[in-house]
Amino acid sequence: MAALVAAAALAAAEPAPAVPQAAGSGGPTSRRDFYWLRSFLAGGIAGCCAKTTVAPLDRVKVLLQAHNRHYKHLGVLSTLRAVPQKEGYLGLYKGNGAMMIRIFPYGAIQFMAFEHYKTFITTKLGVSGHVHRLMAGSMAGMTAVICTYPLDVVRVRLAFQVKGEHTYSGIIHAFKTIYAKEGGFLGFYRGLMPTILGMAPYAGVSFFTFGTLKSVGLSYAPALLGRPSSDNPNVLVLKTHINLLCGGVAGAIAQTISYPFDVTRRRMQLGAVLPEFEKCLTMRETMKYVYGQHGIRRGLYRGLSLNYIRCIPSQAVAFTTYELMKQFFHLN
């Protein structure tokens, strides 16, 4: 999820796609043709690349957040070493297939929703500047989460399994089992409320922080921090290492604010897989249980250091790939 928020934030922070004078294939019409489809592909590719890069860390995060009995006594680095020993190196990528299926529609919905909300907030509500980016980002993130949440539930269930103790044999089997045993469609939306509450500040702060850093950087030091886009020299984009820095700062701040909701969401998503299932039926019960059993640092913020470790490489890949894809698909 973080990777896609970052990718969309990059698009948000930049000016609307410039439309040069007609010149062969680069004219106004060609730049407008299938714009949303090209945006969809750019965001999807960037998200998949970023998520695959940090998939091992995502798997470890799920195991630590939910206190899997095989790994609950270990730290981040110890778990990264223990998973390949117990499950093989592919065990670090368990659940990543479901994530790839989710990440494409997530990116498409988020990007299109962001553009729609941004326009609506600016034209109808008269709000502009960084505030409208904060509002539009929050709304777009929540919209994308609601639409793709069932896939995230399945991914988490698959990631939580360890070798020799499989409840689900694959993505399809997980969908069928959850639907049959956990209340039909409602079973796919366990933990949705803390997810939405966590996504609103996460997406909003990500858009706001990155957009502000980029705007300030390109305004005050364009020659040092920026370069012309390869598909449209009239548009300045951040240099790769500056993208990494700004994205890392935005991701770290947003993650710190929203992390307790992320922990709560994961536990609720796991549902009947956990022995303390009946104590974690609602968001309030889950947060109370985690806090009572493990406290703040080892409970509500358990695994946060892993998220910080994930943040820099994830944002780096997301921003770099998305920049390349935007230029490749003539989106600037």
Curated annotation (Swiss-Prot):
Pfam families: Mito_carr
Segments annotated as Solcar repeats: 34-120, 128-216, 238-328
PROSITE patterns: SOLCAR (PS50920)
Listed Gene3D superfamilies: Mitochondrial carrier domain
Recorded GO MF terms: secondary active transmembrane transporter activity
Membrane disposition: Multi-pass membrane protein
Keywords: Membrane, Mitochondrion, Mitochondrion inner membrane, Repeat, Transmembrane, Transmembrane helix, Transport
Record-level GO BP terms: coenzyme A biosynthetic process
GO CC term, one of those recorded: mitochondrial inner membrane
Subcellular location: Mitochondrion inner membrane
TM region positions: 37-57, 88-108, 134-154, 191-211, 244-264, 299-319
Record-linked InterPro entries: GDC-like, Mit_carrier, Mitochondrial_sb/sol_carrier, Mt_carrier_dom_sf
Superkingdom of the source species: Eukaryota
Family statement: Belongs to the mitochondrial carrier (TC 2.A.29) family.
Protein name per the record: Solute carrier family 25 member 16
Organism, scientific name: Mus musculus (Mouse)
Gene name of this polypeptide: Slc25a16
